[in-house]
Regions:
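Single conserved hydrophobic/aromatic residue that forms the stacking wall/gate
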Residues: 1-10
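Short, cationic-aromatic polyanion-contact patches
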Residues: 72-87
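Short alpha-helical segments that sit at the start of domains
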Residues: 11-19
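Helix-turn-helix DNA-binding segment
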Residues: 60
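Short helix-coil junctions and helix-kink-helix linkers
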Residues: 42-48
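Strongly charged, low-complexity linkers/loops
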Residues: 68-70, 89-149, 162, 167
Length: 167
């Protein structure tokens, strides 16, 4: 019976650890919405094994507490007027959301919000330079790099700069 008692103790400890991981996952989601990957990574950093972290993510996912499609839609709705489509896609992919889920969320958000990337691009340029400004080559390179890093296409950048008579 002592062998059987040891096995019971091990099983009890495993169940306690599993429950601890699940509770931690739910506590993490109380503070902010997270992606599956974000929650999984956070549980690993908290010291849980890969198996326990995966179990906890599956547990909260089954109850609908974590939902990558919902996260992507909310993320896009919040940032659609501040960032380019490409930049938003890149950030969501870094958070572990697959491209198809992001595209579906983008289509849903774009129907409601109608993003105008050229207007956003114009606003970003106006923050730095007035229309009609004359820039030297170094300033122009910096401005172009700044806008390109934010995910704007080069054709759009050049045409907006031309429209604003910035050269």
């Amino acid at each position: 019976t002592s062998r059987r008692q040891r096995q019971m103790c091990i099983r009890d400890r495993d169940l306690e650890e599993r429950n601890r991981a699940r509770k931690k996952a739910m506590r993490l989601l109380e503070h902010m919405d997270r992606t599956e990957k974000g929650l999984y990574d956070r549980l690993l950093r908290a010291g849980f094994s890969e198996a326990l972290a995966a179990d906890a993510v599956a547990y909260v996912k089954d109850y609908g507490y974590v939902n990558d499609a919902r996260y992507a839609t909310n993320y896009i709705m919040y940032r659609i007027h501040d960032k380019s489509r490409q930049k938003i896609f890149q950030e969501l992919q870094q958070k572990g959301i697959d491209r198809q889920t992001i595209q579906s969320a983008w289509d849903e958000a774009a129907e409601l919000e109608r993003p105008d990337e050229r207007k956003l691009l114009r606003q970003m340029v106006e923050k730095k330079y007035a229309p009609g400004s004359s820039l030297d080559e170094k300033e122009m390179r910096r401005l172009y790099g700044y806008l390109a890093r934010r995910g704007f296409r080069s054709g759009d950048i050049f045409s907006v700069l031309e429209e604003m008579d910035i050269s």
